[in-house]
Curated annotation (Swiss-Prot):
Pfam families according to UniProt: Flag1_repress (PF03614)
Gene that this polypeptide is encoded by: fljA
InterPro entries: Flag1_repressor
Keywords, alphabetical: DNA-binding, Repressor, Transcription, Transcription regulation
Phylogenetic classification of the source organism: Bacteria, Pseudomonadati, Pseudomonadota, Gammaproteobacteria, Enterobacterales
Residues passing through the membrane, by range: none
Listed name of the protein: Repressor of phase 1 flagellin gene
GO molecular function: DNA binding; DNA-binding transcription factor activity
Entry superkingdom: Bacteria
Species, as recorded: Salmonella abortus-equi
Protein role: Transcriptional repressor of the FliC phase-1 flagellin.
Keyword Transferase: no
């Protein structure tokens, strides 16, 4: 049986940097923390925390999420387990929800170690939307707001902004792509 190499950029390329450099994400996390912005954190196993970033330790790649800004009831979120960081608009009502840290950080899937910079950058430059297929089954669509080696920023149709980590993506296409 012959092995066929996939050369399609929508499946990504092998990451040049491993482990991931979360410095750009760290800047965004600090901004969200200082401005008490409500966030939705989605893990690689589709567990969801809706709350605030109470504290952040960039050296340990660790977010402490809480149900209140700078709150004391804190859940540890490892950046290595984070699939999506979504900023929620202040106009909508959300139910705050926390899950135990061991459930959130459980790695059900192996990180892809893939880099989707090429397809995301191409869509960004062409002004077309992207469609992101997550390993755990969710499909996201929106317009890219920027990309680096480990994540892509996406503005969704409801106006929310999210950072999607490449390690938990199985494929990214342009939103106008049809199979």
């Amino acid at each position: 049986m012959e092995c066929i190499a996939v050369n399609d950029i929508s499946y990504g390329r092998e990451a040049e940097i491993w482990p991931r450099d979360y410095s750009m994400l760290a800047r965004r996390v600090q901004f969200l923390r200082f401005n008490d912005i409500l966030v939705r954190l989605v893990s690689n196993n589709a567990r969801i925390i809706t709350g605030y970033i109470a504290k952040f330790n960039p050296r340990e790649n660790l977010i402490l999420a809480s149900d209140k800004p700078k709150g004391n009831k804190r859940i540890e979120v490892k950046l290595e387990s984070l699939a999506i960081l979504e900023e929620l608009s202040g106009n909508d009502a959300f139910n705050l929800s926390l899950v135990p840290a061991d459930e959130f950080n459980l790695q059900q899937y192996t990180p892809s170690r893939r880099d989707y910079f090429s397809i995301c950058n191409k869509c960004y430059k062409q002004g077309v939307g992207i469609k992101i297929y997550m390993k755990y089954g969710q499909v996201l669509t929106g317009k890219t707001t920027g990309v680096n080696a480990c994540q892509v920023g996406v503005r969704t149709s409801n106006g929310n902004h999210m950072q999607v980590m490449f390690d938990w993506v199985s494929r990214i296409t342009s939103s106008d792509y049809a199979e």
